Amino acid sequence: MESIHTVRLKPGEEDRLLAGHPWIYRNELQGWPPSVEPGDLADVHDSRGHFLGRGYINPRSAIVIRLLARDRASIDLDFFIHRIREAQAWRERMVDDLRTRPPQARQDAPLPRAAYRVVHAEADGLPGLIVDRYGEAVAIQILTAGMERRRELILQALEEVLRPQAVVARNDSPMREREGLSREHSVVRGELPPSLTVPINGLAVTIDLLEGQKTGLFLDQVDNYRLLERVADGAEALDCFCYTGLWGLHAARYGAARVTGIDQSVPAIEGATALAKRNGLADRCTFRVGNVFDELKERDRRREAFDLVILDPPAFVKTRARLQEALAGYKEINLRAMRLLRPKGFLVTCSCSYHLNAETFRRLLWDAARDVRRAVRVVVQSAQGRDHPILLGMPESEYLKCFVLQVL
C-alpha cells in the first residue's frame, strides 16, 4: 500500500480550500517531509491539525499539492473508475446531443455528438488530467507528476469505462516541464485508424489526434459554433485565426454567402481547405495563409466591408506579467474588426486567456467600440461548453470568453 505523507498549512491559509479550490502553493505550507518524491500522496491539515483533504504533492512545482479528495479515499483503480464514470455520466446528462439517434429517426438526421471532453481536470475531481473522446478513440493529456505516476491506473480505468479502440497520449504541454516531466505524444493503447472523422454540428470533421492543436480540435467551442446559425445567413464573412476553419465552415453551413479564412499555419490552411471540399462548401469558402494583424490592417486600408467577422485567436496572455501587452493586441484586432463591419454587421470575438477575465474583456471591447465611434449591441455572452465544466470556487477553470456583438 502506498505511504501517505502528512503536511500542514500555515495559519489562515485554508480559506481558499474550504471554498472549493483544489490547489495549495508552496508558500502556504509549513513544509513537507524530506522524503517526499514528486507525485507522492499527502494528507493536508490546517494549522490546528484538522483534516482538509488528500492529494498528490510535487515539491518541484509552484502548485505543491493538488487535492484529489476531501476525504481519505484510496487513490486506486476503483477511485479512477468512479471519477471517470461520474464524468461521463455528467456529459450524458448535460450535453444536448450525446444521446444516440433513435432507430425510427431518418437516416439523414444529425448523428449524435461523437467528440467531447470526458474529463476536465480539476472540474471533474482529477487535477492534471484531460480526457477527450473522438468517436472510438480517446486522447489524454497528463499534465502533472501526480497523474503521471498513476498513468497505468488511468489507462485501465478508461478501458473499463469508455472501452476505446485507441488511446493517444498528447503529453506535449509546456506545463509538463514545470512539473519535471518530458513532453511526448504517442499511441499508448490500441491502434489508431489512419483517418478519423467525427460529426460536429452536422459537419464531417477529420481529426489529427497525434499532430493537431490541443487534443485534435477546439472542443470547448463546439457549442459556440452554433451561435452563428442566427447571424451568418447571407453574410460575407471573415474568419480570423481560422486554424482548420471550423468557425468559417459553420458560417457557410448556416448560410453565409462567402467565407474568407486566414491563419499563419500552412498545415492548418491545407486542413481547412480539405474540410471545405469534404463538406461541399468549397464554392463559398476560401482559406489563405496570412498574418491576421497585417491582413486586418490592409483590409481596413482598402476599406473592405463584411457582414460577419470572427476573431478566435490563440491565447495572447500566457502570464499575468504580459497582460498589458496582450490587452493592446486584443484591442487592436477588435477595433479593426469593428471598422470592417457594415452597419448591423456581427462580430464574434473570443479569448481563451484565463488572465483576461470576462469583465476586463468586455471593457476592452467597449473601449474599441468607443475608439471607432460605433454603437455596439451585445447579442450573446458565452463561455466554454458544458463538457468543460467550471468550478465556482476555482476561477482558473473559467477561461473561455465568447461574445457575439452587433455593430450598429
Please place each PLM-identified region on the residue numbering.
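Conserved class I S-adenosyl-L-methionine
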Residues: 234-243
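Conserved SAM-binding loop of SAM-dependent methyltransferases across substrates and taxa
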Residues: 244-257
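Conserved SAM-binding motif I beta-strand of class I
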Residues: 258-263
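S-adenosyl-L-methionine
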Residues: 269-307
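Mobile active-site "lid"/loop adjacent to the S-adenosyl-L-methionine
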Residues: 306-336
